[in-house]
Amino acid sequence: MMVWNWIDRTPRRVLALISLACVALLACGLYLQHVVGLVPCPMCIVQRYALIGLALLTGLASARSAKGWWLTLSALAALTAGFGATVAARQSWLQWYPPQSVSCGRDFYGMIESFPLSRAIPMILRGSGDCAAVDWSLLGGSIANWSFLCFALLGLLLLALLARGVRGARQRAPAPV
């Protein structure tokens, strides 16, 4: 109940915290890439783009004072979180099967440069042999598993924020004549 009251009173702060969480997750990914030496697969890169989109949308929503704007941007952010969770779930699914059952795909940048977007996106989501590899884990969960958990939690928080915002807007709206 206390969480709901906090969300009701400070929706812009919640959006700013979600944006900061996305930036922190991106920083973790860059640390794993540049310091630890892990090379991101195509699906990891798509998840990074989803995090960037989520950070931008929630950052903009926290900066806008008009309720209609933050509700619209929050709804787009919730859809972006759902997309990121879907890609992370797909990658987790690929990891749960033996590597020999996953066919190797093309390089991410090669797909983008060689194919139109309508053909590149299905190829990226299909994954590659690299997407099935588990090179690092924390508490038994792969990066894809943790990514799914983060996207799902951020998406649920955004949905709760939207539900409270829409409910509050309905209560304050004048009654129809």
Curated annotation (Swiss-Prot):
Residues 1-14, 65-70, 165-177 are cytoplasmic. One of its GO terms (molecular function) is protein-disulfide reductase activity. Disulfide bonds join 41-44, 104-131. Pfam families: DsbB. Residues 32-49, 90-145 are periplasmic. Keywords: Cell inner membrane, Cell membrane, Chaperone, Disulfide bond, Electron transport, Membrane, Oxidoreductase, Redox-active center, Transmembrane, Transmembrane helix, Transport. One of its GO terms (cellular component) is plasma membrane. Gene3D superfamilies: DsbB-like. It is a multi-pass membrane protein. PANTHER family: DISULFIDE BOND FORMATION PROTEIN B. Belongs to the DsbB family. This is Disulfide bond formation protein B.
